């Protein structure tokens, strides 16, 4: 088999990036990935190696979205760039520019370097945040033609993803720019590769530990991280994907009580602690005034946001797995991690 081309994946310590690197290596690509801190290199190699990757075809280099250093070397010799890294705040920043500016400037740094090195195509992992946070007529599904209006009252994270993606499309319109394709995932679930859990995976972990004791009827669409990786590769290699954006969702939104029910049905005794009772919407809204974590959830109450995922399926032959399988795989992965941690003690 001829050696396939080299792909740069930004933000190699992240959840989506880790699964994307696994798939690229399994498919025969050479992969280079960036980390903010090169001290993470051994951890990343160990994590990917445990998951079965041939890590000898992986280079790890230091580059940070907030500075110019390292991007030129990172992109050199790569046919494709997968820009996955994005600042995700552990808490809402005091000033929204703390997250908006690095997201936008970081995306432009990657595109400038890709342009300078004649990269063939840059695939950007954006988010449903850039599509679905402005109102639509009730019941109409969100699709790739929709954009969040940053003048609406949206969180700094939502604004950052929208502003960064807009900047990418503006850049792509310039003569001589590489081809650009964008994937916009909804809530990304699936098996964690290490104990550094993404926000969505933390929801499943909390449910397995009996938290919150009463479940808000918050709803969100779900996609499996392995299916996101698959779609990112299709968006990279398929000629039709140039200049296109793709909403990545496995189907219509589910509620926290729906997810809890899947866990109980599929896991049996391992789901003994999963909460059974619901918290009425009015109580969530009242509590949100005092509990910041509930503020994000209170925005997910009421009518679920319908989504239309047909573009990726029909244009690129994408086949996302059923949501119940993703929820189960997430829980199984968490249980394996916790038993591995216990064995190490």
Where are these regions (language model features)?
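Active-site Tyr-X1-5-Lys
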Residues: 152-180
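Glycine/proline-rich active-site loop of Rossmann-fold NAD(P)-dependent oxidoreductases
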Residues: 175-178, 190-203, 235-246, 270
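A conserved pocket-lining segment of Rossmann-fold NAD(P)-dependent short-chain dehydrogenase/reductase
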Residues: 92-93, 149-154, 195, 202-223, ...
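NAD(P)H-binding glycine-rich loop region in Rossmannoid oxidoreductase-like domains
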Residues: 39, 49-105
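Mid/C-terminal beta-alpha module of Rossmann-like enzyme folds, strongest
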Residues: 231-294, 323-345
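Conserved Rossmann-fold NAD(P)-dependent oxidoreductase catalytic core, especially the SDR/UDP-sugar
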Residues: 83, 87, 93-157
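Conserved C-terminal active-site "lid" loop/helix of NAD(P)H-dependent oxidoreductases
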Residues: 286-317
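N-terminal Rossmann NAD(P)H-binding glycine-rich loop of SDR-like oxidoreductase domains
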Residues: 5-29, 34
